[in-house]
């Protein structure tokens, strides 16, 4: 089996590539290294079964050649992180929507099974918790850049589902909820690596807003395992599937737990959203997934707790000091 992973040099993508190699696949990685790195792939690159092509998925001819060579496609290439979305909205929209359209066209041309990684952000301001795949989505106004990412990902979902309806292209859409683990960068606003690095360096642990917003964090190994199973599951075709962990914690309690596990003396400092992201920033108070569909389709159940995640991230970040 030869598998194409767009965005395969990124945090989630590289973990998926490692799993695919372990199960015997040959892997093509298509990544422009805008957020991914060579380092994420170096420990598994034997020069034969994994090949990295440094190019943007918006390059239609290169992408088409990669899709044609592969037997199936995981599409992870995307702008990521709140900070990048706020700072570079044009890049966010063009890379997400244009890239997905390019990959889907080639998948349809060669009839390659396609898995899209979407995001829990598409639930927007929805208040029904836990979020189920068939729930309504509630977006904020277009004047607030924060919603450009969610809206672009929602358009990706519509496009993938349109290919399923019109051409029966085998597609699966996954909505990922706060995936975390070693090698994740804090550069683009990822909360756990940011907290851990601040704590280990004795810097203030900066919590945005009042800290009472809550999230659920899933280990990247659990998430990558679910992706690998879903693309190979016929019953998942044409469906949207939540992937994450349904154990909820407030961001303030997360900061306290990081401080405790690192043995840090850092203070916890509240930073207004406006100071962090500019005037008029919107956020979701709670984001909790229903995992019933994933469990039904592939027996998905997160196996690693938040403390497991934090322990792994802390151990990794200590090696970087």
Regions found by a protein language model. Give the residues of each.
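Short, surface-exposed alpha-helical segments at coil->helix boundaries
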Residues: 38-41, 157, 193, 252, ...
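Hydrophobic alpha-helix immediately C-terminal to the catalytic Tyr-X-X-X-Lys motif of short-chain
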Residues: 155, 159, 163, 195, ...
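C-terminal substrate-binding subdomain of Rossmann-fold SDR/epimerase-dehydratase oxidoreductases
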Residues: 19-22, 55, 178, 199-321
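The catalytic Tyr-centered alpha-helix of NAD(P)H-dependent dehydrogenases
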Residues: 144-152, 176, 184, 188-192, ...
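A glycine/serine/threonine-rich, flexible loop-to-helix segment
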Residues: 129-131, 186-194, 282
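Residues that form or flank phosphate/diphosphate-binding pockets in enzymes
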Residues: 12, 36, 61, 186, ...
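Short, solvent-exposed loop/turn segments at secondary-structure boundaries
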Residues: 87-88, 183-187, 280-283
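N-terminal Rossmann-like NAD(P)+-binding domain of SDR-like oxidoreductases, especially those catalyzing
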Residues: 1-179, 313
